[in-house]
Amino acid sequence: MGFDRQYSREFVRTFFTSPAAVTDAEDSAKMLQKGAQLRGMQAPDVWVPDNEDATAPVMRDEGVQNIVEVVAQHGADFPGEIHPRIVWHRPDPAMRYRGLQQMVKIADPDAGAIDHIDGFVIPEVGDVDDWKKADEAITQAETQHGLEAGTLS
């Protein structure tokens, strides 16, 4: 017996974060590789390759490259949404610029990952001014690569 909803609602059942790069490992992308290959009930609705809190600052450049490579390789088969988390700190313009650069690298169509990325997690966005700065950065990443406005969220 079917059920007709009187409304439409979307929700996230689960999300999963993976460090974008780990130190002291033969393969710094090993945690991303594991997250990208989760399937069935083990797979989250949203996977967050985390290049912020979960990744050591000295590993973040490598983390961006790992995100690009792993998502390009496994993104088409991942059953949920993919939202990489970039660095972003509202009081620090230099950190916001690094976050923009991370988005630009991840969104590069020639790198092969962007077709599988649903958006970005931008941490520490607080007031309306923060939202505007984050939106401006996303728009810059889209524009730089000729992506349609709204491609990234």
Language-model regions, residue ranges each:
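Conserved alpha/beta-domain cores
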Residues: 2-153
